Amino acid sequence: MGCERDPGRADVPSPLDASWDRVDASTKDTASDLVDATVDATVADLPSTDMGHPLPDGALVDVRLGDLSPFVADCSVPLGDPRREPQETLCDGIDNDCDGQVDLLLPSGPNACSVEARGVCSTGWAGCAEGARRCFAPGPSPEVSDGLDNDCDGVVDNARAAALRPRVLVLAPRYLWTKGGDEIRALASILDQWGIPYDLPTPDTEFSAALRGLLGRYSLAIVPGYLEGDAVDTIARLYLEEFATAGGVVLLHKPLTSPSSAEVLRLAGLRRTTRRTDVTSLRIGGVAVPAVRSLDTAEERDLLVTDDPSARPVETFVLEPDPEASTVIAARAFAGSTEVGAVLTRRGLGHGAVYTLGHDLHSWSHYRCYVNCFEPAGDVLGLLIRDALREGAAGHLVVKHTVPGLEDALLLSTHDIDATESARSGPWGAAGATQMASVLHGRGAIGSFFFTTDYVSGWWDPATVRSVCALGMCPVGGHSVRHFTSPASQPVGDCSERFPGYVPTTLAESTLCGEARVSLMLAGEAAGSAAVAWRSPFLDVHPRLFDVLSEQGVRVDSSFAVGDFKTNLPLDLAATFHRQDLFHHRGLTELPVTLDDGFGARDEHGTLRTELQASNASSFLSAWSSVMLRNAANNAHTTLLLHPSFGVGHGPENLQVKLAVVDRLLQLAAAAGLRTDVSVTALDAFWRARRGALVDATYDSTRGYQGTITAGPTSVAGLTLEFGDALRSFDCPDCGPTRLAGRRVVLLGALPPGRRVEFTALPR
């Protein structure tokens, strides 16, 4: 069964349109090398891979890549054609290396490139943008002690001596609080997502009072808008200018042009701002400023605001720099193909800077793709803030890493059990769920299984849940009883529905409460542990779903795709700015689906769904690997949704194809240094505990880092700190065992609730 809620959108392009980015070529076998081997060779050329493991009932899953038909896409460029390449390097609209993808340049070998710059800014990887080959190289960042020329001035490790506190002050105008505070909570949730230490003063705090003594207490001050004179008066401007001159960074958001806004514009280094609703895209480029250093792919630099400004207008403030203020443009707004002005500027002040952003990145960004693609638009603001903090802290920041460990990111393997062959054994062998669990277990991975408990049709089998649990894949989640869609007209019910009395044979006889409550109850009973995770059939969300899930004790949901939120990190739905008509500030964690084993399109014949199968497996694998690695470069996660079933219109052999592709993806993830052994419920528990843990640190050029970690209301295990510098030592007597690698330190034990510990760390 397909689980895309919106496969028929005309604006959803092919998911196989992504480029690679940032692979560590120093590793013995890079992930791109492994993908090359998979794409360029037939399966018969690959070694047989036994993914079988004995199960409690004696069944054995034995899937061998060599037994499958070759994973080779149709190729229109024959051998001997001068356009044929072993690895694609051209941006010519042709699949030159026959991997099923057009103009996908892998970040290895011939795609290394250079630009006219020094230090780390001089080299990067080529990619295709607007039909042309471009070199995507990082911009400068503050110098730190790591053996590299980070600020690209031609000198290695010439870090500025400093005594500072890498922390953010969010100073929200009072009117944002009086509006309800949704924008403020959304900004705070982004800081929480990226583990950035911050303070958010109360609504009655006066600007001038909060800004006194700013120096030494913060490295970045964010003033969200709209901004007028009542937010930034003369005294506030002088404090902020003094802060920036001494090395701090200020980020202003959406200043207005009005009779009272002269001080705001003067601080920003702008002449005026103009409100527009015809902007369709934002393009980062021009001057390489430190705050956009991490935005180094085409998808991160070219953000779609709306596909139709006449039907869906979005407010953007175009900024006009003051030429006398040395203000530079870091991003521009476009109406169609016409540039209409600046949308991100930087005014240099002394040792620091004032940035101004004219667009609301945390709530308005139209998606270019729905699933099976690299969609980082919702992560751009977090990356920008993290780099702005890095600039204000002269590179010496401390943040909470997004992973419970030293790895760069997570691959979350999730599986919807919504077909007979995935739910129970038969002529095809063990249930598809059991076979998938065996593959995962064989690679040391942990999957999350969402069970449809269809006892009405007679294929619900609790023994399958028990076999999955025996392989370490529990707790499991709910996926409904009958796998119906959930239109708004579906009755909610009163949540008194019980098994076996709840017997819906049609959608009209079903209730939202019954589908959720009974599915969660049966799945939990079969697993022997409460089911606290949920995914809606077809990713179709009922308007009252989150009220019902919250009342049933669900803590984590995965019913949206990356195209819905444009983020690749868990979301706190209580603080999410938009769609509170659905969420009602319910405290669930949302994990958007990044990858799916099918994708949709619409043509004159209607809505179609293309399933993963032998003929397109190499294309899926290339696209999935590309997305996974590019997310990992941002420390963002990738959530895979794969159905361990035959698929639409295919027989038992297609299940074996899916198992083999997942096995190969797990190998690629391991080669790239990703964790694959974290379930959605484990990630939710870590994410909540991480959010409650407080980290505070200072940096001194003679003593290094000194700081504290305070656990929140729940115990936090696996908390990992990421520093701006590579470390030679980390000392925390009360932390328990720790492990240090490069810039990261993981606390191997668990800090009890409310426990406060002190640490010191010395750069190399």
Predicted segments, located by residue:
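Metal-dependent polysaccharide deacetylase catalytic core of the NodB/CE4 family, i.e.
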Residues: 258-272, 279-280, 408-411, 419-424, ...
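Membrane-associated feature with strongest affinity for ZDHHC
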Residues: 71-162
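Active-site-adjacent pocket scaffolds in enzyme catalytic domains
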Residues: 281-305, 311-316, 320-321, 337, ...
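A glycine-centered loop/beta-turn motif at secondary-structure junctions
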Residues: 167-168, 182, 186-193, 217, ...
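Helical hinge/lid and interdomain linker segments adjacent to catalytic or ligand-binding clefts
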Residues: 169-171, 176-266, 441, 449
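C-terminal domain-boundary segment and adjacent tail
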Residues: 200-202, 384-406, 442-444, 561-562, ...
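A glycine-rich, often tryptophan-bearing local segment used as a flexible ligand/cofactor-contacting loop or short
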Residues: 228-304, 324, 334
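Ser/Thr-rich, Pro/Gly/Ala-heavy low-complexity intrinsically disordered linkers and tails
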Residues: 1-81
